[in-house]
From Swiss-Prot:
CDD domains: AdoMet_MTases (cd02440). Belongs to the protein N5-glutamine methyltransferase family. PrmB subfamily. Its EC number is 2.1.1.298. The keyword Transferase applies. Methylates large ribosomal subunit protein uL3 on a specific glutamine residue. GO terms for biological process: methylation. The gene is prmB. GO terms for cellular component: cytosol. It comes from Shewanella oneidensis (strain ATCC 700550 / JCM 31522 / CIP 106686 / LMG 19005 / NCIMB 14063 / MR-1). This is Ribosomal protein uL3 glutamine methyltransferase.
Amino acid sequence: MDKIFVDEAVTELRTIGDMLRWAVSRFNDANVYYGHGTDNAWDEAIALVFHALHLPEEIGQQVILSNLTSSEKHKIVELIIRRVRERLPVPYLTNKARFAGLEFYVDERVLVPRSPIAEMIANRFGPWLYGKPVNRILDLCTGSGCIAIACAYEFDEAEVDALDISEDALDVAQVNVETLGVMDRVFPMQSDLFSAIPEGPQYDLIVSNPPYVDEEDIGDMPDEYHHEPAIGLASGRDGLDLTKRILANAAQYLTPTGILVVEVGNSMVHLMEQFPEVPFTWVNFENGGDGVFVLTRDQLIEHQSLFAIYRDAQ
């Protein structure tokens, strides 16, 4: 972005509203991609400007007319320039992301939380878990810990094991566990899927948002996604390397009334093509999103022969 253009913004713009308008114009002109917690330029501008000013996004409209100091304008412009030039997702610039009504710390060690599973958590995974005990939950590929922690908030008597192979991701998850006050019920641990936990029926719910982007899609993703850790996105030729292992192993860790919930995004097409006999229930979301399936323990056991070649060695 031209220095003269930036100096002009700092010199001539006066109010918060001016900066919001300028940010929206810059985002639209640069054709940035929205897919990390917002879907439009205005919400991105609000997030960056209010973060720079240490203001809550829910503050009244009257503040829009407030004048800015020179240092405040410089700080805002710097964030907007980074968003445009580097194509950094807003949550990596603010280190904040909201998920299931909670605010999480995030940085480039983890994916930005955005799973539609948040809606299922708010609905307590109904109807599958209605009236059933939920004492222990397993979150595979936990990343920032957002799903695990949100589950702990919704099921306030349950313990949640939050597993990930990435030590970097687990460091972020631990920050969120401590910040959100669930140290006594959410337990991050390093594990290659199920490798770190003893075999046996112990979880009433296994939930996972694993890597699921296939080889074809990974190269076509907008620049913003390339700031996220590749280990959290790519999963082989068809995007299902980890999902197949989860399907092959999950049943032995579920209680008799337990369920498996997995997000596979666009790779749902590959999954249905490869396993047409499996009765996946694909969740319909009111707030947008797709590619999340549910299977019961009994359904997993019934179709274990289809997944046998993907089972981890014991």
